[in-house]
Amino acid sequence: MLLKNASFYDDEVLKRADIRLKDSLITEIEENLSPINNEEVIECEKLFVLPSFIDLSVTCLEGYENLKQKAFKGGVGLLNVFNGDQSDIKNIMAIKNNQLADIATLKHKGGEILIAPSDAFLELISHYAKSYNLPLLISLENSFEALNSGALAYELGQNFVDNAFENTRLVRFMEVSRALQIPMLLDKVSSATTLKLIKAFNDLGAKLQAQTPLSHLVLDESVYEDYEPRFKIAPPLRDKEGQNALKEALKNNEIAMLTSLHAFKNSNAQLFEESAFGCESIEDAFSVAYTFLVQKKVISFQQLIKVMATNQARFLKLNAGEVKENQLANLMIVDLNAQTRVSNQNSPFYGLELYGEVQRMILKGQTTFIKENACKKS
């Protein structure tokens, strides 16, 4: 496959060239490449090529193939799915049914990432991660309270997460990272206090990174005043001050990765109190991130690529996440000028007008998604 006249970033440098894909890899990046042996040619003039996103915090409740198609539409090529047998990234859930999993056997069967859902068996899990050099994702089970503690929770009479206790378990992991020099990714970080603790422990020698839900950078808890079930997300959204603190942390590279936190809302309940938690957002991931983070100048386009593709690939030790020769050809082609509106009524972003739209998804050199009438063959 040959991508003609592609605009892309090589590190921080904006370039325009032709990109050849062959045998799952990006094999050539040069100007004026010619097709070889009936090679498929995709005209990318006025379009942008970037690495496909990697989402490390996805819950599948709607069927894996349906989830994958939604992900492709949102520019997400690889998924780490928590609760199913199918996942692009082979994960090892360290604890199942309150018992320690057979981590050694699962590693030998191809496990690529170790997930700790609680701080039980912390010592054993940490030593397995260190011994097998496994990326360790700390994704603690949610308390499933509707709001964070504060004036709005009291005003609305909703159950809330007590902020005084939200970091007590995480601190144990932070200290283990420092003491044993184990790299850890802390999932669903939505508190400025958590980010300050991460920085403090890293200053002491820990190897911690933070991953934050995209929704928490776009929305704040004021949406709860409408009592709409689509906003019932775990962990809960923050107040405006907390949201602004997250944006500032992202701008200052204190947040390493973003996640759609996608979870199908497996409920038709009309009342906020009775509805299921969830965040149906992955199908609009690129457009939401581009509109609210890049267009609104929270971060640069280059930084968006890093926090949604490059840093994830490095954490997983994958040969992907950048547009470079000899990297895996996991790419998306986008139209940055296209305008769309979120149509999924269960999405927290429903009704929002967005900029940027995925035209084509390519995984290992093969097209997996194409928007109708997009990316014409030349």
Residue ranges and their predicted role:
Residues 274, 328-375:
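C-terminal cap of metal-dependent C-N hydrolases
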Residues 75-79, 90-91, 109-110, 176-184, ...:
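Short, surface-exposed connector motifs at secondary-structure boundaries
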Residues 1-36:
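N-terminal metal-binding scaffold of metallo-dependent hydrolase/deaminase domains
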Residues 158, 164-171, 176-181, 253, ...:
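His/Asp/Glu-enriched, well-ordered alpha-helical/loop segment
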Residues 6, 24, 46, 57, ...:
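Divalent metal-coordination and catalytic microenvironments
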Residues 105-258:
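Histidine/acidic residue-rich metal-binding segments in metalloenzymes
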Residues 55-61, 74-104:
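Metal-cofactor-binding active-site regions of metalloenzymes
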